[in-house]
Regions:
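Amphipathic alpha-helical interface surfaces
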Residues: 40-47, 70, 86, 98
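Extended, low-complexity, intrinsically disordered C-terminal regulatory tails
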Residues: 45-75
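Glycine-rich, flexible loop/turn motifs
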Residues: 4, 70, 79
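Detector for Asparagine
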Residues: 29-30, 42, 71, 96, ...
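Extracytoplasmic cell-surface/polysaccharide-interacting catalytic and binding patches
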Residues: 1-54, 118
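Catalytic cores and adjacent binding grooves of peptidoglycan-active enzymes
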Residues: 79, 83-125
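N-terminal start-of-chain detector that recognizes signal peptides
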Residues: 33-34, 59-65, 93-97
Length: 125
């Protein structure tokens, strides 16, 4: 993927979806299959970028795409949308406000799950 192709939107890059600290630590290949790229683009263009603009605060992708092996090792659901490029776990300073903004924005989404103790929000399209 060329450098220009890595930027998905003004606020999100493809490499944010691929990076995994656990994959690096364990030496796992979390390479992105070409068939999930359209789903990642859809998630970013239709949900994440509009939400980021509405929220007006940084949102950081903690977990994006996961290979089947990585998903298993992190304890993800066997049918996790992360493996399809349809979900992200994000961090933002004010998670409650982000959820309020998500509802107020009227954006279409599948799931929004607040993990209070882990400090992130799972979003899927």
């Amino acid at each position: 993927m060329e450098k220009d192709e890595k930027r998905l939107t003004e606020h999100f890059r493809m490499d944010e979806f691929i990076y995994s600290a656990m994959a690096v630590e364990l030496g796992l290949n979390n390479a992105l299959p070409s068939e999930v790229i359209p789903a990642i683009r859809n998630l970013t263009v239709r949900l994440l970028e509009p939400l980021r603009i509405y929220h007006r605060q940084p949102m950081y992708i903690m977990s994006g795409y996961r290979s089947e092996e990585l998903n298993r090792l992190v304890g993800g659901a066997p049918s996790s949308q992360h493996m399809k490029g349809e979900a992200v776990d994000i961090y933002t300073v004010d998670r409650n406000r982000l959820l309020e903004d998500l509802v107020a924005s009227c954006l279409n989404f599948d799931q929004a799950i607040l993990y209070r103790t882990k400090g992130f929000i799972h979003l899927s399209s």
